[in-house]
Amino acid sequence: MRRIVLASNNPGKLAEFNALLAPLGLDVAPQGELGIPEAEEPHATFVENALAKARHASRLAGLPALADDSGICAHALGGAPGVYSARYAQLAGGPKSDAANNARLVRELAGHADRGAHYVCVLVYVRHADDPQPIIAEGSWFGEVIDAPRGDGGFGYDPHFLLPALGKTAAELSKAEKNAVSHRAQALAQLVERLRLFENA
């Protein structure tokens, strides 16, 4: 198994990445396990944040690094919370928790007829900290935000993210179902394909 560092300590993301990357012979270690502090995320785009996190983790670990920047974008809110998804409630003086973030999103959407939203995931893989050709992949997953949470799986906004075609929220999907269709799975499929192209070039 080849070891790479994940520029995150999010247990939900770590579990998803390990499930999706283990078949490729990659062992994903969270940066906290290697004593690496979290990078700053000062940028206004998912791509810039993911690249900054990947370079930071790779530099401190001396390993290839994979970074994910992801979030949910509500159409009626101009794409908010977007890059601020993980700390959406904090920005309004609330606690940092999934429940608080979901509560703020539902509150902000009250009175809006358009409940459409999409998850975005941008993945950046660097072979080393100064990699001049980082591999960048992106996935989007479209659905609607519902007021009442449903399901016990997933994390983040999943209990409020309804997939109308399936009649389920992301939190009601099995891990296998989610890993087949999620924004992260789409981005990872792109990333794997690009990694293969680079290795065979």
Swiss-Prot record:
The chemistry this enzyme catalyses reads: XTP + H2O = XMP + diphosphate + H(+); dITP + H2O = dIMP + diphosphate + H(+); ITP + H2O = IMP + diphosphate + H(+)
EC number(s) per UniProt?
Answer: 3.6.1.66
Q: Matching Pfam families, A to Z? A: Ham1p_like
Q: Identify the residues that bind substrate.
A: 8-13, 70, 155-158, 178, 183-184
* Molecular function terms from GO: dITP diphosphatase activity; ITP diphosphatase activity; metal ion binding; nucleotide binding; ribonucleoside triphosphate phosphatase activity; XTP diphosphatase activity
Q: Which residues form a coiled coil?
A: none
Enumerate the residues binding Mg(2+): 40, 69
Gene Ontology terms: biological process: nucleotide metabolic process; purine nucleoside triphosphate catabolic process
Kindly give the CDD domains that the UniProt entry links to this protein. Answer: HAM1
Q: How is the cofactor bound?
A: Binds 1 Mg(2+) ion per subunit.
Q: Which GO terms describe its cellular component?
A: cytosol
Q: Which UniProt keywords apply?
A: Hydrolase, Magnesium, Metal-binding, Nucleotide metabolism, Nucleotide-binding
Cofactors that this protein relies on: Mg(2+)
Assembly and interaction partners: Homodimer.
Q: In UniProt terms, what function does this protein have?
A: Pyrophosphatase that catalyzes the hydrolysis of nucleoside triphosphates to their monophosphate derivatives, with a high preference for the non-canonical purine nucleotides XTP (xanthosine triphosphate), dITP (deoxyinosine triphosphate) and ITP. Seems to function as a house-cleaning enzyme that removes non-canonical purine nucleotides from the nucleotide pool, thus preventing their incorporation into DNA/RNA and avoiding chromosomal lesions.
Name-wise, this protein is dITP/XTP pyrophosphatase
This chain's source organism reads Ralstonia nicotianae (strain ATCC BAA-1114 / GMI1000)
